[in-house]
């Protein structure tokens, strides 16, 4: 007999974390047995989601996208580290505004280095919300790579400097070094391991070649060209038309040098339009300003659809087995939601077990037919209760509880008055 309800939402951007959404929905369901599994698609909010499901938060002081120190977190459990690029190198880490030509992914590399030094055997890298278009150069430098110009000088931060790239030396990756200058802090969810402050160039005891890397991303853009990292995403990071051309040239140079010095990477052709083949042309290479390319080419990462991989990490299939209903959602259910974002991934996973799915959202702009084709039988929007979007953003919690009560009435009447056997727990 089907028993519990699985609550598996993504965040409501700018209002509530995924865990907060799940808690509000659970409260609105009353005595219905629930299991809360906050989810994410690999973008911002990924660390929060996996911490809510039992991973330990590790907080570290690292280098922000413009060089300022920032406190960023990753999540760890049983030799697996989940690193979210937006934590260290995201747009929200730009207090002085965009820096499209000079922003760096160095801090993300420092998070990875810290995780490896503290025992991570697998690193899941969530890409999304990045401030930089540096092709992952900063991340590689933080991990010990040397990116040199023709005079043997280390390149400064940022995508513009890549135009002068002559050599990429990753020999340190196999030498058991995990570089970094980060400083570790205590965490409310648990301490990392009691080693205190991690200054300088630490030693992981093994090379990065011994670490498995997975890129969790739903972005399918290549590195270069009209659908590449610079053309599509750098304008969102403050790049004007001239900046886009500079960044495209830098990424093309990175791909060319990588192809020349690391033959398996691929090659670049110039025939009026820059075309990348090999790794640079793979779907996802353009994710997060080209960090996807660096992970594929130099860390030998695998790319996995973000929501699918994270649902596996959180053992969603096991938790949804025997459920009466799954409630998913995100801030806006729109056309983007139909292209592989978290609610669709949750719906697809639930469908394998024959469990119906409904969604909560702040607002929606897709039809009932589109929802049903995506595996979601019904959607409940905050704007159904409060047409003022600003009020919905400011006070979403009580509205979510009211939506959950409607869901209980519409779909869960056999549970009326029953005791919450799952105790509102999290996965």
Label every model-predicted segment:
Residues 1-185, 189-427:
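N-terminal loops that bind phosphate or other acidic moieties
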């Amino acid at each position: 007999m089907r028993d519990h309800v699985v609550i598996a939402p993504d965040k409501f951007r700018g209002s509530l974390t995924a865990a907060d959404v799940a808690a509000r929905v659970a409260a609105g369901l009353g005595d219905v047995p629930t299991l809360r599994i906050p989810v994410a698609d690999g973008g911002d909010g990924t660390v929060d989601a996996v911490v809510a499901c039992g991973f330990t938060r590790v907080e570290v002081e690292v280098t922000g996208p413009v060089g300022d120190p920032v406190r960023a977190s990753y999540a760890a459990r049983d030799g697996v580290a989940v690193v979210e690029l937006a934590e260290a190198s995201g747009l929200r880490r730009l207090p002085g505004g965009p820096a499209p030509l000079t922003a760096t992914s160095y801090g993300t590399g420092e998070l990875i280095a810290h995780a490896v030094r503290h025992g991570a055997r697998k690193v899941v890298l969530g890409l999304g919300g990045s401030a930089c278009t540096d092709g992952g150069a900063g991340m590689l430098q933080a991990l010990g790579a040397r990116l040199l110009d023709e005079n043997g000088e280390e390149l400064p931060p940022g995508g513009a400097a890549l135009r002068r790239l002559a050599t990429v030396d990753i020999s340190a990756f196999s030498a058991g070094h995990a570089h970094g200058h980060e400083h570790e802090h205590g965490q409310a969810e648990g301490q990392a391991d009691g080693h205190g402050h991690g200054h300088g160039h630490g030693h992981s005891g093994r090379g990065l070649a011994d670490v498995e890397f997975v890129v969790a991303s739903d972005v399918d853009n290549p590195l270069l060209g009209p659908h590449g990292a610079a053309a599509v995403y750098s304008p969102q990071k403050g790049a004007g038309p001239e900046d886009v051309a500079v960044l495209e040239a830098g990424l093309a140079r990175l791909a060319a040098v990588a192809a020349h010095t690391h033959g398996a990477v691929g090659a670049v052709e110039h025939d009026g339009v820059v075309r990348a083949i090999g790794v640079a042309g793979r779907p996802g290479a353009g994710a997060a300003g080209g960090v996807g390319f660096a992970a594929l080419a130099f860390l030998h990462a695998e790319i996995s659809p973000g929501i699918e991989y994270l649902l596996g990490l959180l053992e969603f299939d096991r938790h949804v087995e025997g459920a009466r209903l799954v409630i998913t959602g995100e801030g806006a259910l729109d056309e983007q939601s139909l292209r592989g974002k978290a609610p669709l991934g949750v719906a697809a996973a639930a469908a394998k077990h024959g469990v119906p799915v409904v969604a909560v959202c702040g607002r929606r702009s897709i039809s009932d037919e589109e929802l049903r084709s995506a595996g979601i039988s019904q959607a409940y929007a905050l704007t159904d209760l409060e047409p003022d979007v600003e009020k919905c953003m400011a006070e979403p919690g009580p509205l979510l509880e009211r939506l959950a009560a409607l869901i209980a009435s519409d779909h869960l009447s056999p549970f009326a008055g029953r005791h919450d056997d799952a105790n509102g727990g999290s996965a």
